[in-house]
Amino acid sequence: MPNKYFDIKAQAEKTDVYLYGFIGNSIWDEINPKDLIDQLSEIKSKTIDVHINSEGGSVYGGNAIYNALKNHDAFIRVHIEGLAASMASIIALAGDEVYMAENAIYMIHNPWSWGEGDANDFRKKADQLDQAKQTLLNVYERKSEQDRDVISQMMDDETWMTAEEAKGFGFVDYISDDVDLAASIKQIDSESLKNRDLPDSLKAILDKGSINQPDDGNSKEVHAMPTKAEQQLSLIHI
């Protein structure tokens, strides 16, 4: 049974890879690195177009996908079509060229986790979170050429960006025409996004997407932006 949240359409010259959903770290997750990387290794096309609409997920799983794309022999073009938030914003930067739809959204913030244990366990977890942040800062800094302290503060603040803003910071290279936001946003719980601390400009983008249009029966299932209680305790997410 094909994976519902990522799809690969291979052709001789160009292959399209669609990453729509939560980025996990096991075979049970919507976008799991093992299946995706196994399929990427079989692609012989000269160009890979990666289409992203994702709320993020596992730091470890996302880093594995980022590295697989970055090290692939093909020329990688990334297209942010709806949302590239959290770990998805890292995967997007694996592209040799990064395109972002004019009505798409880009977000960066700090890794988070939760669990149980004594004070020593939580100190170790805090150290792991600090280490994870440094690995992400390496990627953001390399792509954007922004000062590391500036990016770190943006992560601390949880920064949401329009395409114009993301391009201004150097995270994306080109702004492309609007995509059908209504179709893209059905993959994400847009109401959960609008309930977050978004700038008014980004809330307007969500409203403009006409997300309440009748479903044509062909869209993928809506998947809510995961809460901390829904994630595995032992993993670090972003």
Predicted feature residues:
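N-terminal organellar transit peptides
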Residues: 1-87, 95-236
